[in-house]
Curated annotation (Swiss-Prot):
It comes from Sinapis alba. Residues 1-233 are annotated as: Alpha N-terminal domain (alpha-NTD). GO terms for molecular function: DNA binding; DNA-directed RNA polymerase activity; protein dimerization activity. SMART domains: RPOLD (SM00662). DNA-dependent RNA polymerase catalyzes the transcription of DNA into RNA using the four ribonucleoside triphosphates as substrates. The N-terminal domain is essential for RNAP assembly and basal transcription, whereas the C-terminal domain is involved in interaction with transcriptional regulators and with upstream promoter elements. Its main location: plastid. Keywords: Chloroplast, DNA-directed RNA polymerase, Nucleotidyltransferase, Plastid, Transcription, Transferase. Its EC number is 2.7.7.6. It holds the Pfam family RNA_pol_L. This is DNA-directed RNA polymerase subunit alpha.
Amino acid sequence: MVREKVKVSTRTLQWKCVESRRDSKRLYYGRFILSPLMKGQADTIGIAMARALLGEIEGTCITRAKSENIPHDYSNIVGIQESVHEILMNLNEIVLKSNLYGTRNPFICVQGPGYITARDIILPPSVEIVDNTQHIATLTEPINLCIGLKIERNRGYSLKMSNNFEDRSYPIDAVFMPVQNANHSIHSYGNGNEKQEILFIEIWTNGSLTPKEALYEASRNLINLFIPFLHVEEETFYLENNQHQVTLPVFPFHNKLVNLRQKKKELAFQYIFIDQLELPPRIYNCLKKSNIHTLLDLLNNSQEDLIKMEHFHIEDVKKLLDILEKK
């Protein structure tokens, strides 16, 4: 077993690239480290970063093809070696690089015989092809083939829902994921209570961006997700008439009361003292100070009433609900 030595900072949190290579036009690899981290931090960051790398980074794909030469999705065209389905699959694999917003409509227009590759796609200036040699189709006879394309920038997956044969237009399954794979591993070092961790992150991309660019993009997206939590005060949102309204769930204290009353007679509640509920000492003392001595006293208070009590928190309401659920 070969052990690799990596120099890491022992005081200031730092990251560095320890390996970077280009295996092909459509396969880049990078390995990065972040250290020093306290125990548990490496796993937290590694899981979040891997998910952000695979799901939060945008990519550009061909999402639709249209041609008068294409009669049906799975048919064969005279003068073309590949079936329509094979051509659509080849278009699906074309790797594009762009920062575009919205959609663009490039096209292919070629006269046979000959090979059609990604080089034959006429693109707008804002879009680049990563590998011009990617195969699309083979024309075996002197025919003209023109295909209109639609490209979009998005994230995740976009699965075609239906085929529109009437206008000879066909949706293409798109995978807007420039990061093909991402792994993380953790190395611990130090003695006793002084143990620290090094986080290793491995990234493979399709060539539309480098692993270093992917790491930066994923980090920025994670930061943007957490920015709202940095505001000290909770914001009030006002919905327009045409926006969807969502009812936020509240702790079902009232529902628990209704359920309990259905199971038992309310008269019995006044004979069940909170001493019998096996409450944590702090919750028990808070209730006693507020003159809540029986289960009936407790259930006659709303969730809001309980939270207003001194030293009584929302977590205590949750705890009470759990205890009542078991009774």
